[in-house]
Regions:
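N-terminal intrinsically disordered, cationic/polar leader segments
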Residues: 1-35, 39-42, 46-52, 57, ...
Length: 115
């Protein structure tokens, strides 16, 4: 992630409410996935793993914010687990397919949180 992106995310986080933080967290995940795809193209496998781990950690942050008094949280939790597992598989296989599958699901959720 570029230094400017980090500064932008930091500024936005300091000015956001709870739902805004969720949206920003998704955007951080997408930035890390972009970093992983770039590292993959350049065959920089250590950077690839680091970016995927950071994306997994950000998904973990989303999981920690779930309120299980709502039924939808259980469904979101399962989706997040699937996405984390997909990124682990991508790391193990050195594959973009699993990244794209996880990103597709996360982008759909991101769109719903943006509304």
């Amino acid at each position: 992630m570029e230094k400017e992106q980090i500064l932008d995310f930091t500024r936005r986080i300091s000015q956001s409410n709870r739902s805004g933080l969720t949206v920003i967290n998704y955007e951080i995940i997408f930035a890390y996935l972009d970093d992983a795809k770039k590292a993959y193209q350049e065959e920089k496998w250590e950077e690839f793993k680091v970016a995927l781990r950071k994306a997994q950690n950000s998904i973990g942050e989303l999981m920690q914010t779930l309120d299980f008094s709502y039924d939808i949280s259980r469904n979101l939790y399962r989706i997040y687990v699937f996405c984390k597992d997909s990124l682990a598989a991508a790391m193990y296989k050195r594959s973009l397919t699993e990244i794209e599958n996880a990103e597709k699901m996360l982008r759909k959720l991101y769109q719903s949180f943006c509304k």
